[in-house]
């Protein structure tokens, strides 16, 4: 799947203008891809049960990293502070928090389930199960919101809720959580002028075509320009400074333009295949920890891809969510590959058992 990016990344004019090197995006991503594939292979050959012991520590580590970002480093790239930078190397802790949340929830819910025949333990037990399960998740989400990064926060809440639902969380608690989350989301949008502008431009992209609605408008132009078969590899015009973030959050628009409707459907089909294999691995896992871990990794990828597709196609307001495995970005690519390595190990053990 990652190979799709070689035909869509703006590796020519855009990279030359920004960095003075025509292939810097491709070279950087290729290096990170090799590192990620190595990590994926190591985790694929490592028994996933070894992750059960220190899993409770991972959220704490990510919280510390996120606090370091907010309090000390404050790298104001695009008016945000989402990275810890060590010279030319940048780490995005919010991406690491995704795996940490999945590991913690799988570990915690597995511990609570010991001795029970069915995953019914968290239907009513709010104080002893739901609250301690979700508290570290909410801490991570709160810190990510402070960066600010609403898109990643929503993504984490979605796959965390999915894990809890499969573990037995009743619709009553989901409805209660939604009733609390929706007013909070409204406040987060209305209190931030740029978010409000994005929401208004989502309802009417033509209301501010040179301002808040510019990115969505250019994205839709790219998608519509592709037609059935696309304009051809490396022939995208929208990525040449017309479409902001063409190599990251809006790379799917470039794929639609270059490969057309057929290429766009193929990319979606690849994620469907990934999801199908991941869900099969989850249901065939030897134990509850593996089942929840596989489900968490799979839904992490699928929710993120769905949000990205929806943003690019103008179905939801614009958010900064990369397309898994394809968008340019080292932290996201590494997390997705490492998660896939764990998923492959679970699938392998399920097959052997």
Identify the residue ranges that each predicted region occupies.
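Short, small-residue-biased leader/transition segments that mark boundaries at the very start
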Residues: 1-9
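Membrane-interface transmembrane-helix boundary segments in multi-pass integral membrane proteins
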Residues: 8-10, 24-29, 329-330
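Hydrophobic alpha-helical transmembrane segments of multi-pass inner membrane proteins, especially
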Residues: 16-215, 253-311, 338-342
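Glycine/serine-rich anion-binding loops at beta->alpha junctions
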Residues: 87-97, 146-148, 227-232, 321-335
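Transmembrane helix boundary and interhelical junction motifs in multipass membrane proteins
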Residues: 149-154, 231-236, 246-248, 261, ...
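TM-adjacent membrane-interface loops and short helices in multi-pass inner/ER membrane proteins
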Residues: 201, 205-248, 252, 259-263
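A juxtamembrane structural motif centered on a specific transmembrane helix
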Residues: 306-353
